[in-house]
Amino acid sequence: MARFSLVVVVTLSLAISMFPDTTTAQLKTNFYGNSCPNVEQIVKKVVQEKIKQTFVTIPATLRLFFHDCFVNGCDASVMIQSTPTNKAEKDHPDNISLAGDGFDVVIKAKKALDAIPSCKNKVSCADILALATRDVVVAAKGPSYAVELGRFDGLVSTAASVNGNLPGPNNKVTELNKLFAKNKLTQEDMIALSAAHTLGFAHCGKVFNRIYNFNLTHAVDPTLNKAYAKELQLACPKTVDPRIAINMDPTTPRQFDNIYFKNLQQGKGLFTSDQVLFTDGRSKPTVNDWAKNSVAFNKAFVTAMTKLGRVGVKTRRNGNIRRDCGAFN
């Protein structure tokens, strides 16, 4: 009996090793090498044209990719429009603030690709978003990297599926680590991806608690740089519309760089979830390292983005190539 059990275990082990994770195995940088060989150049051109219209395209696209991948995987389900019978992901409260320019650049790139007969209905919206995300990072002077392709578009998008799957502005390191671990991402990946906050903006309503009503002892979060706290109070007075936008990075808001970590060292992290990366002993060494070593940070960011792009990838069995990125076929 023991010998039989051993044979079964060995057989199963061999079977598992012979059939790796198909969702990862299907991804490759030249996935469209035969069907649409110029896909990267076409998407890049659209991205560049869109950025000329508005800088918001850069942070909007980067944030859209993250929000998509963290809810049911990188399958462009965040792009689906709600219908009378289905409230989609994009209409969940956590996604309402996603800027339209991120959606628009994907839609425009899809249109440009479909205008080429050999590419028409061949490239998934999920892959377009992944490519556009790399291109906006590069446009902001961030690192370039090869994008793995071969994702299929998701067949489901519900607002309910967003619940509890996206990090919040008040999360602590333990909460962040658990959330990222669900997607096979490490603490180092979490810190690297958090640095996407070197770009873009947030809304005043997300920081009111840190600058006016932190706790019973302190009105202002004591981990906030005092001068920075006053700047935030001027930008976000108590009576201001909570939707008013403020820069995530007060120093270089239009450039992808490691200044994000230097800001944390000075108490200038906008969200609690940013500043805790420096105040928590588990993550502080990494923050200090990347604050002085941009090469190490860029390398870690590329690794994290590649791993993020593999989360929940759909195959031909549970996905398709959407004709309209905002609607199911």
Swiss-Prot record:
Ca(2+) 1 binds at D68, V71, G73, D75, S77. It holds the Pfam family peroxidase. GO terms for cellular component: extracellular region. The active site is at H67. Substrate binds at P167. Ca(2+) 2 binds at T198, D249, T252, D257. SUPFAM superfamilies: Heme-dependent peroxidases. One of its GO terms (biological process) is response to oxidative stress. Expressed in the whole plant, with the highest expression in roots. This is Peroxidase 73. Removal of H(2)O(2), oxidation of toxic reductants, biosynthesis and degradation of lignin, suberization, auxin catabolism, response to environmental stresses such as wounding, pathogen attack and oxidative stress. These functions might be dependent on each isozyme/isoform in each plant tissue. Heme b binds at H197. Glycans are attached at N215. Transmembrane segments: none annotated. GO terms for molecular function: heme binding; lactoperoxidase activity; metal ion binding. Belongs to the peroxidase family. Classical plant (class III) peroxidase subfamily.
